[in-house]
UniProtKB/Swiss-Prot annotation:
Binding positions for (R)-pantoate per the UniProt entry: Q62, Q156
Annotated positions binding beta-alanine: Q62
Known catalytic reactions: (R)-pantoate + beta-alanine + ATP = (R)-pantothenate + AMP + diphosphate + H(+)
GO cellular component: cytosol
EC main group: ligase
Complexes and interactors: Homodimer.
Described purpose of this protein according to its UniProt entry: Catalyzes the condensation of pantoate with beta-alanine in an ATP-dependent reaction via a pantoyl-adenylate intermediate.
Keywords tagged on the record: ATP-binding, Cytoplasm, Ligase, Nucleotide-binding, Pantothenate biosynthesis
Taxonomic path: Bacteria, Pseudomonadati, Pseudomonadota, Gammaproteobacteria, Lysobacterales
Organism listed in the record: Xylella fastidiosa (strain Temecula1 / ATCC 700964)
Record-given protein name: Pantothenate synthetase
Keyword Transferase: no
Gene: panC
Amino acid sequence: MIDTVTDLSRLRGIVADWRRQGLRVALVPTMGNLHAGHFSLVMLARHYADRVVSSVFVNPTQFGPHEDFQRYPRTPEADMRGLEHVGCDVLWLPSVETMYPLGTERTVRLFIPCVSDVLEGTFRPGHFEGVCTVVARLFNQVLPDVAVFGKKDYQQLVVIRQMVVDLAFPIEILGGCIVRESDGLAMSSRNQYLSMQQRPQAAEIHRTLIAMRDAVMSGGVHADVEAEAVRRLEAAGFQVDYAVIRLPDLCEPIDGIVISQGIALVAARLGNTRLIDNLEF
């Protein structure tokens, strides 16, 4: 049975006991409202560790002033049942006071330069600062051997890997594959904001990503591929923040040079719902 923990001292005691037994510990951080994508991360963690801690914390410092912190869906009972079903050992439920004992205004903040400034960083200033701040605290609380993050938030994964290297966290970072609906839409907690009319439209993002990948692999000019992706998404009713081709480290590829590995990334709004997705190749 899953152990739900709200006290940091108790959490540390549990993890310390696992350590004394020589067990390997994994952390799966989440903001709750869990779906099959999240549960796949827990199952991946179980392959790399003997015990799994999953945290649920809706982090106020990674939401912008006009974003959806207050209305972000919270489903604690369903989250607990789902985590127990996939073999999570501990559900860590810290309070805002536990995460930010000096308050969010006075807290020490972490900023990862360069990779935090582009794409999502341009459209959500301060977002990755909040992400890194809370993830570093979770690392210090749980002291995991391995931590698992979803590849749907690909830029977040790159940012966290850079933070782990730079701050010498002795933690292996794993990226879990995107889990999709039958029509290709990436599973997301924000999909439930979509209306019945918008839901079929949303799958156009994945189809556009496939077209971007195919065009690049056929020798298409990156700028032309990106422009066509924007046109296609706008024709489907989206307001596009970006539709880009990048190298795996998120650097821009040089036109005219064939890239052996890359990633197509899209962020776009359908009505009031902002969706992100990507496709590696």
